[in-house]
Regions:
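Conserved AAA+ ATPase "SRH/arginine-finger" region at the nucleotide-binding site
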Residues: 98, 174-187
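C-terminal helical "lid" of AAA+/P-loop NTPase domains
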Residues: 209-214, 220-234
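A short helix-turn-beta junction within AAA+ P-loop NTPase domains corresponding to the substrate/partner-engaging
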Residues: 92, 166-180
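Walker A/P-loop
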Residues: 11-25, 59-97, 112-115, 143-144, ...
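Pre-Walker A (pre-P-loop) alpha-helix and adjacent loop at the N terminus of AAA/AAA+ ATPase modules
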Residues: 26-69
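Short glycine-rich substrate-engagement loop in P-loop NTPases that contacts/grips substrate
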Residues: 52-54, 93-125
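Conserved catalytic/switch belt of AAA+ P-loop NTPases
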Residues: 62, 132-171
Length: 258
């Protein structure tokens, strides 16, 4: 069975900060995002150009052979989710770290453990969130372990890799752009939320569209807002004005490092 490890545990598009559980293991009282966590790559919305049969990730899965990649995209587009499900799809051990919270000691431990698993024929997918936060020397530290196959690296970044990552690291990894989720993809997330809750959101059709528009392509934000709406009882569905009054207005520009 595939082994999963987090050093430390990290958030993703559909989950909080705990290691991923299978849908059957998620409690009915868990946050909405956890209960909507995809179980397969095919369930990830909005990135079909990458995960579909003709996409780079889809082709890797079909071939059963995964190369190191850098996932570049805005927040809330499913970078961590995609990496975790990619490991599942090709049968790799999944380890996730964050460049914000991890240092040299953490990396040494990850690589040492990956070598031990490699000796028994178990390969490791190492997911590095916010990989651009590692300095140049730390980025260089990945090279020998990527080159000898100790780990297959999947890095995630919201920043342009050409400016933030070493040329040597980029030459050993394929950069894949993940798109901001469009209206149909976000609407599909709300459909799933309504299905799992067993009731529609307390919104008029126009307010539902306004909620989708307010997410600005961020699926994580949308699900959090939906959960907020489900936590309150309303006498009647909210119209756009009522929705705007209820929810805090979304900040137009996020901290680029969130």
């Amino acid at each position: 069975m595939r082994d999963a490890a987090y050093l430390p545990c990290m958030a993703d598009l559909f989950g909080g900060t705990e290691p991923a559980a299978s849908p059957s293991e998620v409690s009915a009282s868990a946050p909405l995002a956890d209960r909507l966590r995809p179980a397969r790559l095919e369930e990830v919305v909005g990135q079909e150009h990458r995960t579909g049969p003709e996409g780079a990730i889809g082709r890797m899965v079909a071939a059963g052979k995964l190369s190191s990649i850098i996932l570049w995209g805005p927040p809330g587009t499913g970078k961590t989710t995609t990496a975790r499900l990619l490991a599942d799809a090709v049968g790799l051990r999944f380890v996730a770290i964050s460049a914000v919270f991890s240092g040299v000691a953490d990396l040494k431990k990850v690589f040492a453990e990956a070598k031990e698993h490699a000796r028994i024929g178990q390969r490791t997918l190492l997911f590095v969130d916010e990989i651009h936060r590692f300095n140049r020397a730390q980025q260089d530290g990945f090279l020998p372990f990527v080159e000898d196959g100790t780990v297959t690296l999947v890095g995630a970044t919201t920043e342009n890799p050409s400016f933030e990552l070493n040329a040597a690291l980029l030459s050993r990894a394929q950069v894949l752009i993940l798109r901001r989720l469009d209206h149909p993809a976000l609407s599909q997330l709300l459909d799933r939320a309504e299905a799992i809750e067993g009731r529609p959101l307390p919104l008029t059709p126009d307010a539902r569209d306004a909620l989708v528009a307010s997410a600005d392509g961020d699926g994580r934000f949308l699900l959090n807002q939906a959960e907020t709406l489900y936590s309150v009882s309303f006498d009647a569905p909210l119209d756009p004005a009522g929705l705007s009054a209820f929810l805090q207005r979304r900040v137009a520009v996020y901290d680029k490092d969130r």
